[in-house]
């Protein structure tokens, strides 16, 4: 029996997938638990419509990410963070992902999730650092972060 999976079923299929499964398994388990439905013409067209909508949404997200990358990688886009510095030249504290996200919001009005900023170690020295930001699975931008003395 051909079914359309409504949810991911381990070892059988993923959501939206059309697959041939044993009739008893389909009727007694998958359909009863609302994990799948019979693959009728209406169900197949619905799946195609959902796939098209998802593809369109994915394309929009990719376009947004590319536009944001253009803004972040402009020459004049430098995130400046001021920190107190000791006599030896080391900063008191460190700059982390949340600080960079907050500075982007306040200086350039760009709301960026701190989890997208790929800072491996906190920044503890004065100067300019290039910090990668993963905007989309296919788009990664590099933001210049300048740590200066307050």
From Swiss-Prot:
Keywords: Ribonucleoprotein, Ribosomal protein, RNA-binding, rRNA-binding
Alphabetized Gene3D superfamilies for the sequence: Ribosomal protein L9, C-terminal domain, Ribosomal protein L9, N-terminal domain
One Gene Ontology cellular component: ribosome
InterPro entries: Ribosomal_bL9 (IPR000244), Ribosomal_bL9/RNase_H1_N (IPR009027), Ribosomal_bL9_bac/chp (IPR020594), Ribosomal_bL9_C (IPR020069), Ribosomal_bL9_C_sf (IPR036791), Ribosomal_bL9_N (IPR020070), Ribosomal_bL9_N_sf (IPR036935)
GO biological process: translation
Pfam families, alphabetized: Ribosomal_L9_C (PF03948), Ribosomal_L9_N (PF01281)
Statement: the UniProt record of this protein carries the keyword rRNA processing: no
Coiled-coil region: none
SUPFAM superfamilies per UniProt: L9 N-domain-like (SSF55658), Ribosomal protein L9 C-domain (SSF55653)
GO molecular function: rRNA binding; structural constituent of ribosome
Role summary: Binds to the 23S rRNA.
Family: Belongs to the bacterial ribosomal protein bL9 family.
PANTHER family associated with the record: 50S RIBOSOMAL PROTEIN L9 (PTHR21368)
Name of the protein described by the UniProt record: Large ribosomal subunit protein bL9
Organism from which the protein derives: Lactococcus lactis subsp. lactis (strain IL1403) (Streptococcus lactis)
Recorded name of the encoding gene: rplI
